[in-house]
Amino acid sequence: MIKLYTAPTPNGRKISILLEELNVKYKSIIINLDKKEQFNRKFSNISPTNKIPVIEDCDNKKIVFESGAILIYLAQKYKKFLPKNNYWQVMQWVIFQVAYVGPMLGQAH
């Protein structure tokens, strides 16, 4: 199972979308950004940048933060959406989304 520490933001939503597409069992833990919960001690222990999203993979106790890294981790773990023959093409679009599209969506949020 995956624990997803998230908030209703574009970066938080993209991880839950992928988890749904992968049909993976997960639990969402909502971090209230308005109440500054991202700065509490417990969350700071798993997110060195105090940002969402973060996942905790309960199968192997791995913690992954940053949305792009999480997307890649999940795609590799579940062997879906990251084809070997088009790996670099997919990676280009993931990085493009993280670097350009994501920040614009965050500003519109």
Question: Residue spans of the language-model regions?
Answer:
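GST-like domain detector, emphasizing the conserved glutathione-binding G-site
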Residues: 1-109
